[in-house]
Amino acid sequence: QGLFSEINLASDKLGRKYADRNTKLCAIISKIAEGIADFSTDVDALGDAYEYLIGQFAAGSGKKAGEFYTPQQISNILSAIVTLDSQEPKSGPRRSLGSVFDFACGSGSLLLNVRHRMKAAGGSIGRIHGMEKNITTYNLARMNMLLHGVKDTEFEITHGDTLANDWDLLRETNPAKKPQFDAVVANPPFSYRWEPGEAMAEDMRFKNHGVAPKSAADFAFLLHGLHYLKDDGVMAIILPHGVLFRGGVEERIRTKLLNDGHIDTVIGLPANLFYSTGIPVCILVLKKCKQPDDVLFINAAEHFVKGKRQNQLTEEHIARIIDT
């Protein structure tokens, strides 16, 4: 429902006059129809073509790309991490993953990467959950799911504000009925400015750790995901490098997470991996019942291939991170 609600057929980009717009639309539809008539491959190829176009659009969009696209190389690392067994990661991928959640899902590419990795390893995946604030990007994600052959009964992408937690599914007050997910992945907007009210201090997501500052909601996103993670689940989130050393309330949240044993691994990545920013980033891996109590630090900041626009991680770089 509403999948094409953001398409503006009256846009001046199609022509100033009604007749001009009509002519151009007819030409576009005719070309698409010709392509479909010659298209005889499987659904995955159609979905991959759509994913490729999103990637090409992201490459040309610069900073705007950060709103909807996670580079494939980053997505591969996150999906590999959350599909490993939480207590015995050396044993390889899980045989099944009941649910996966991305609370800032963009075009849905990260969720689909988790699904693809599980399927490729001969495993099974249950329900896919996502949340996206931008209405256009929300529709992109739903379309991406359908074009990759994910049935509408197998996924639930919701349009809403994660920080406000305005998804009824997640606002269940009965602890016994609180939704929890086997895997949580996210690439939320970096250092996002927000306006937490006084009531946020009593929000169950932040009550035990503290509320992130107005200047940067990074830890608010992290705590949101951790709150809905199962006790034996794995969460992997991309955040700006600053979350590792900024002071004030962020330092207190970070210390509490460490003391509670929730931070499993910190992976430092090279700068300039994203279309939207050149700052260095890190991956934080979180668990609720991790063993042992120490934290693994992986410094991959110097391992990359320099590209024209962005630095690149090769398959070898990615494999070394995951194997470690």
Predicted segments, located by residue:
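Non-catalytic, mostly N-terminal accessory regions of nucleic-acid modification and defense proteins
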Residues: 1-87, 153-162, 268-271, 292-301, ...
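A generic alpha-to-beta junction signature in SAM-dependent methyltransferases
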Residues: 82, 122, 229-230
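Conserved SAM-binding loop of SAM-dependent methyltransferases across substrates and taxa
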Residues: 107-123
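Short alpha-helix immediately C-terminal to the canonical SAM-binding loop
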Residues: 111, 136-140
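Conserved SAM-binding motif I beta-strand of class I
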Residues: 127-132
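S-adenosyl-L-methionine
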Residues: 140-176
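A conserved structural/catalytic subdomain of Rossmann-like adenosyl-cofactor enzymes
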Residues: 162-165, 171, 175-324
